[in-house]
């Protein structure tokens, strides 16, 4: 059994019944027999389990799971309660506080976001303990690009949040090419986004899309345009404009 949630398994056409996803899963399971792999096996597909297709309203793409003990829980950027906030998540919270004018959360568990329809998807679903991006060649990207493409075809409004070049590349590869979506570069720190400049890409008359790009929230790049990008309020404005309830970003 793959552990992939039934709704996504159906939408994706049972990907683990065929190659290459079958081999990817087998390779990850073999690695987990030889060394510690994060997150735990039961959480490899946590993002898809907590956010089924019919509930997706936002997709936030990450790269691969945290590789230190006790951190990874199957949701991009999220850590378990009681775990020290990683630097990128700390910067996400700083931007949330600046954007919404509310105190930053203390805990790093983003499960409440996932349960509201925020798909927190890493493009690589496993990692070896202590070795960042060590499973990048297992082939998880085939599955996660299928998920991204499926999310882009959903009938409801969906916002895509692409922080950093790897996330942006994953999105555009998944949908085919850049001409299939209009993408706005978010402003540099200290500059407000142009009024009415939100990027909306329509995949059909009933499926408006918002695609937001910005530098990664890592301390190495957050000051190059992530801070000041206001993704949380802009997502909620997009959802409201399309008749959807806002995301409760405070935890």
Where are these regions (language model features)?
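Short, basic, low-complexity termini and linkers enriched in Ser/Thr/Gly/Pro
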Residues: 179-182, 187, 207
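A polyanion-binding, active-site-adjacent surface
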Residues: 2-169, 174-175, 204-213, 217-238, ...
